[in-house]
């Protein structure tokens, strides 16, 4: 009987303490649109099951991928390394940032530009020497980038409040802490182009570089920011109500954008968004008790008008899931991820 009393006492003391203890977030209400059905262009298929898993078991969380002129594959991993996969499959360390490298892209001089969530915007030369380009604009979560023909780097800061390990808190708080910025290597100046984005993520320039796309992961949408023409300096909705959380996006500079969706929409999360009090309570729980993403592999091909021209799936997520980035190179798609131990390669 004493154990029953002890349990009741624990409940009497513990529950009010949990309820009234300060929450790590101050969440806002948000009523998401109903998730689209997976029909038409979104119809599931098994295309991603043909993906070859490179360096399986030898890398962890290579979030973004790029390939150099010699066909060597680069990715930034959870332990702060930029790994390089040689043609024979050998994995070596190209550089160590000491942070969490996320988006990366080669410039025209062969330098690897890296968005490091902790260190800012970095440049790494062919010898692996690291130079910090920008830590300005009070960013704490540098995320993804693309580079135009003049060398200007367009990049995102996902959140100016939450660091990379706290991305689920940013999701639940549902407030616009993200920014979209540019860095000019000639003047070494950083400019904030857009504020008030809901987890600013993937960045991709159009074929003619007249506009750039920016993913808002936690609003299931893509924003178009105009760089040239009458609309230069303005932005508009490019695509809305996606079937999952948009992460990385890239352009093949031939009119096609490749969009990575690491997780499908989650009805529990969508329903919680209308109940800020419950979100604040959940945010007090350990990370392993928070809602989990359903394993699913999904990559979308988009044209420059925002139409889905192709979708690639692994519907049961057994072979490949959690795709965070996708890059087209020499007839293949290369795919990265946040928490898996491979680099994906799929022949087009």
List each language-model region with its residue ranges.
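Sequence-structural signature of mature extracellular/luminal beta-sheet repeat domains
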Residues: 1-348
């Amino acid at each position: 009987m004493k154990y029953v009393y002890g349990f009741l006492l624990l409940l009497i003391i513990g529950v009010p303490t949990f309820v009234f203890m300060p929450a790590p977030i101050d969440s806002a209400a948000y009523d998401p649109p109903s998730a689209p059905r997976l029909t038409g262009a979104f119809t599931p298929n098994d295309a991603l099951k043909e993906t070859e898993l490179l360096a399986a078991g030898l890398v962890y969380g290579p979030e973004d991928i790029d390939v150099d002129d010699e066909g060597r594959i680069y990715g930034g991993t959870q332990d702060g390394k930029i790994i390089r996969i040689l043609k024979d499959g050998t994995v070596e360390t190209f550089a160590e940032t000491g942070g969490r490298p996320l988006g990366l892209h080669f410039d025209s001089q062969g330098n690897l530009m890296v968005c490091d969530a902790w260190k800012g915007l970095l440049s790494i030369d062919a010898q692996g020497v690291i130079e910090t380009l920008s830590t300005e604009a009070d960013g704490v979560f540098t995320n993804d980038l693309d580079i135009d023909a003049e060398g200007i780097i367009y990049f995102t800061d996902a959140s100016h409040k939450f660091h990379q390990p706290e991305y689920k808190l940013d999701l639940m708080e549902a407030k616009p802490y993200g920014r979209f910025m540019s860095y000019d290597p000639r003047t070494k100046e950083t400019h904030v182009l857009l504020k008030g984005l809901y987890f600013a993520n993937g960045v991709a320039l159009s074929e003619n570089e007249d506009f750039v796309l920016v993913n808002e992961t936690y609003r299931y949408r893509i924003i178009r920011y105009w760089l040239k023409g009458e609309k230069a300096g303005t932005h508009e909705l490019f695509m809305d109500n996606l079937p999952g959380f948009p992460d990385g996006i890239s352009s093949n500079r031939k009119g096609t954008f490749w969009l990575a969706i690491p997780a499908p929409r989650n009805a529990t999360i969508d329903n919680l968004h209308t109940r800020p009090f419950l979100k604040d309570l959940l945010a007090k729980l350990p990370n392993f008790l928070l809602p989990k993403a359903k394993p699913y592999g999904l990559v979308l091909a988009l044209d420059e008008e925002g139409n889905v021209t192709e979708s690639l799936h692994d519907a049961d997520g057994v072979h490949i899931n959690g795709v965070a980035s996708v890059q087209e190179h020499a007839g293949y798609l290369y795919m990265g991820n946040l928490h898996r131990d491979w680099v994906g390669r799929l022949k087009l």
